[in-house]
């Protein structure tokens, strides 16, 4: 049995930026403090939502180190360290671990899609380079590559491969992974609209975008489930759906950064090639925030 890196709601945190595109570390610190105050169970820095794909390594590592220092062991810090270049990924994994991250989030290789055997070799090499627990990230809608349940089983035998963030949207696949891997691979939902279904299959929590705007909602949903109050968990899951829909009306993190700006945070804009949402989608996002009581005007 592998102890989970965290249990509950981890936030896939945004990276706030100034007008010139540089990281606004002061605002990042304020957002982290607010997340912890609202009982977020883990901070995931430099993931998809954090725009790691447009960060050079030195900037990414600076964001990881800053987050580790601000969090100061209050909750686990999970650092995005994925790459479609295994050698580069190994170097990034090692340096992220040196920054003090508690675990690494590693996406499957993208564009130069490999085979299932290649996935085993890739994740094994990167896990051993990092030397700390790894959560694999399966998001075939972005990468064009799926981690098959049988591959998850093989990788779960490695002592450092601790979990999988499952964002395939395929509940049947998640069930198969749970059946094959049991307690040797901790499953986290990568979709805010599928938190309770994955918990019901033995999942340990969610890596959430919605947590950026309403962390207590996602935390309370997970807590209710683990406390045995499935009716409340179901209610909170359904309450989450309008926010989840709005925050994915365009490619993540475009909507969530806009939402954070509306809520008064200095989130800034996304780096190109991502641009701000359309006017229609801005209205849609604001409507969802208003319905949840997050804005009143």
List PLM regions with ranges.
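Short, flexible micro-motifs
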Residues: 11, 15, 24, 50-53, ...
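A general structural signal for well-ordered alpha-helical segments in protein cores
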Residues: 28, 60, 64, 89, ...
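Short secondary-structure transition/capping segments
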Residues: 55-58, 91, 116-119, 147-149, ...
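Alpha-helical structural signal in soluble globular domains
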Residues: 62, 66-71, 95, 99, ...
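Glycine-rich phosphate-binding "P-loop"
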Residues: 138, 160-161, 271-272
């Amino acid at each position: 049995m592998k102890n989970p890196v965290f249990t509950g709601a981890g936030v896939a945190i945004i990276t706030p930026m100034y007008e010139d595109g540089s990281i606004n570390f002061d605002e990042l610190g304020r957002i982290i403090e607010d997340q912890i105050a609202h009982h977020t169970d883990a901070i995931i820095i430099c993931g998809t939502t954090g725009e790691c794909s447009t960060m050079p390594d030195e900037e990414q590592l600076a964001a990881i180190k800053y987050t580790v220092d601000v969090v100061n062991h209050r909750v686990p810090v999970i650092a995005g360290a994925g790459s479609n270049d295994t050698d580069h990924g190994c170097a990034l994994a090692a340096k992220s671990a040196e920054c003090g991250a508690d675990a690494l989030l590693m996406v499957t290789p993208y564009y130069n899609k490999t085979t299932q055997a290649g996935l085993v070799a890739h994740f094994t090499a990167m896990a051993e380079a990092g030397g700390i627990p790894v959560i694999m990230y399966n998001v075939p809608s972005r990468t064009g590559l799926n981690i098959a349940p049988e591959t998850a089983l093989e990788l779960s035998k490695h002592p450092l491969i601790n979990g999988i963030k499952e964002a395939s949207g395929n509940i049947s696949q998640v069930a198969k992974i749970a059946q094959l891997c049991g307690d040797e691979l901790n499953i986290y939902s990568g979709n805010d609209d599928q938190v309770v279904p994955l918990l019901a299959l033995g999942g340990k929590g969610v890596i959430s975008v919605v947590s950026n705007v309403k962390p207590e909602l996602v935390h309370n949903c997970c807590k209710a489930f683990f406390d045995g109050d499935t009716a409340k968990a179901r209610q909170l899951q359904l309450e989450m759906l309008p926010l989840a829909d709005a925050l994915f009306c365009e490619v993540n993190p475009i909507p969530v950064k806009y939402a954070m700006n509306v809520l008064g945070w200095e989130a800034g804009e996304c780096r190109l090639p991502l641009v701000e949402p359309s006017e229609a989608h801005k209205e849609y996002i604001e409507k969802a925030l208003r319905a949840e009581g997050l804005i009143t005007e």
